[in-house]
């Protein structure tokens, strides 16, 4: 007997497009924020690296918190979709802010500005969005083959987006003037792309009714606290570089 299917092809593509949103934030941040901060703003890379490491403390705590909150959420949109939709707006604001550090401020204020928005992005908005996105596979289908397909499509979109971000970003920055304002414009372009693709992903799927879901859905929400991180983005980027070589 064939296992029941829950998703059409456009539902699967729509889900995969959610990793366009994830990578216009994190591929961009992972591969270019240090260059922007050191070469354009003039901050010390050692201090920036330390601030990023400290931020991971908050990140580890927030993983557990948001996993629990999503598990307890009950809305007309479902458990995960609201957490995927609205926090991404915060991702956009934080990403733009990180690439819009006021050049007239003193160094201490600039470090503080970066750290605050980096923590808000990495440990707050992105964590909520990405854990919800990861949990969604268990909430929109009970078909194991479809869940595998969703995961595969997610990787394809992530890999492709990361590769494109690496390939075009320097060219875009140079085109817009190769200065602080140019980085702001490029960040804004990526934010708009991210918001659009994330919204499409959310609206392309509908969570199954609670009485139709089994216990595996709750287990998958907890497992989703292992979210897609900066390290994962870097690994995808390195893999794409090897493919081009």
Name each region found by the language model:
Residues 2-244:
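Membrane-embedded alpha-helical bundles of multi-pass transporters/translocases
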């Amino acid at each position: 007997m064939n296992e029941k299917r829950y998703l059409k092809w456009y539902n699967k593509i729509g889900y995969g497009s959610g990793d366009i949103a994830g990578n216009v934030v994190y591929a961009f941040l992972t591969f270019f924020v240090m260059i922007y901060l050191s070469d354009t703003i003039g901050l010390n890379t050692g201090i920036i690296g330390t601030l990023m490491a400290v931020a991971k403390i908050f990140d580890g705590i927030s993983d557990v918190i948001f996993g629990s909150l999503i598990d307890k959420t009950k809305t007309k949109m479902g458990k995960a979709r609201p957490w995927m939709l609205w926090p991404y707006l915060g991702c956009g604001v934080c990403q733009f802010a990180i690439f819009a550090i006021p050049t007239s401020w003193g160094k201490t204020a600039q470090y503080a500005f970066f750290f605050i928005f980096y923590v808000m992005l990495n440990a707050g908005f992105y964590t909520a969005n990405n854990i919800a996105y990861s949990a969604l596979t268990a909430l929109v289908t009970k078909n194991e083959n479809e869940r595998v397909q969703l995961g595969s499509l997610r990787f394809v979109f992530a890999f492709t987006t990361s590769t494109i971000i690496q390939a075009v970003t320097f060219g875009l920055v140079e085109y817009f003037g190769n200065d602080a304002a140019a980085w702001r414009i490029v960040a804004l372009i990526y934010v708009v792309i991210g918001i659009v693709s994330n919204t499409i992903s959310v609206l392309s799927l509908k969570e199954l009714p609670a009485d139709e879901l089994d216990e595996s859905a709750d287990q998958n929400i907890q497992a989703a606290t292992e979210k897609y991180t900066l390290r994962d983005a870097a690994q995808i980027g390195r893999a794409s570089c090897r493919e081009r070589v």
